[in-house]
Curated annotation (Swiss-Prot):
One of its GO terms (biological process) is sensory perception of smell. The keyword Signal applies. Antenna. This is General odorant-binding protein 1. Keywords: Disulfide bond, Olfaction, Sensory transduction, Signal, Transport. Belongs to the PBP/GOBP family.
Length: 167
C-alpha cells in the first residue's frame, strides 16, 4: 500500500513538473539562440565588453535593467532575427516562427508572444526605442519568472559550456 501511494505521488509530481521543465528548456534554447546575435550587435549598440559580460546574466536575480545600451543591444538582436516591425514593435508572426524554430517549440511560443505583447503595451508610451525595449525586457523577465518558465543561470551556463566544448 505504501509503495503504491509513493508511485502515485511520484507520477503526479512528474506530470506536474514535466510541462514546467519543458517550458524552462524551451526558454533556455530560445535565450541561447537569441544570444547568438549579441556579438554582431555589440558595436552598433555601443555595448562595452563589461556590459556585454553582464548581459550573459540576464536571467539572474540581480541583473539590473539600468543601461540604455542593453536596450539598444536587444533592439539590434531583435532586428537581426527580423522580430520587429518598422516601428520597432514586436512582429508577432516572425517572433512566433523564431520561437518555433527551437525543439519543443509549440509548448511556449504563443505564451511568450502574449507575454511580450502585454509588456509592450505597458511601455508603449516611451519614445526612445532602446529604453522602451529595455523596460519590455525587464517586464518579460519578471513575467517569465512569475510563470515559472525562466531558465536558471545554472542551466544556461551548463548548456553554454557544453556548446563551447563541442565547437
Amino acid at each position: 500500500m505504501a509503495h503504491t501511494l509513493q508511485t502515485v505521488v511520484l507520477l503526479l509530481g512528474t506530470s506536474i513538473l514535466h510541462p514546467i521543465l519543458a517550458d524552462v528548456n524551451v526558454m533556455k534554447d530560445v535565450t541561447l539562440g537569441f544570444g547568438q546575435a549579441l556579438e554582431k550587435c555589440r558595436e552598433e549598440s555601443q555595448l562595452t565588453e563589461e556590459k556585454m559580460e553582464e548581459f550573459f546574466h540576464f536571467w539572474s536575480e540581480d541583473f539590473k535593467f539600468e543601461h540604455r545600451e542593453l536596450g539598444c543591444a536587444i533592439l539590434c538582436m531583435s532586428r537581426h532575427f527580423n522580430l520587429l516591425t518598422d516601428s520597432s514593435r514586436m512582429h508577432h508572426e516572425n517572433t512566433d516562427k523564431f520561437i518555433k524554430s527551437f525543439p519543443n517549440n509549440e509548448v511556449l511560443s504563443k505564451h511568450m508572444v502574449n507575454l511580450i505583447h502585454s509588456c509592450e503595451q505597458q511601455h508603449d508610451a516611451d519614445l526612445d526605442h532602446c529604453w522602451r525595449i529595455l523596460r519590455v525586457a525587464e517586464c518579460f523577465k519578471r513575467s517569465c519568472q512569475e510563470a515559472g518558465v525562466a531558465p536558471s543561470m545554472e542551466l544556461l551556463m551548463a548548456e553554454f559550456i557544453m556548446e563551447s566544448e563541442i565547437n
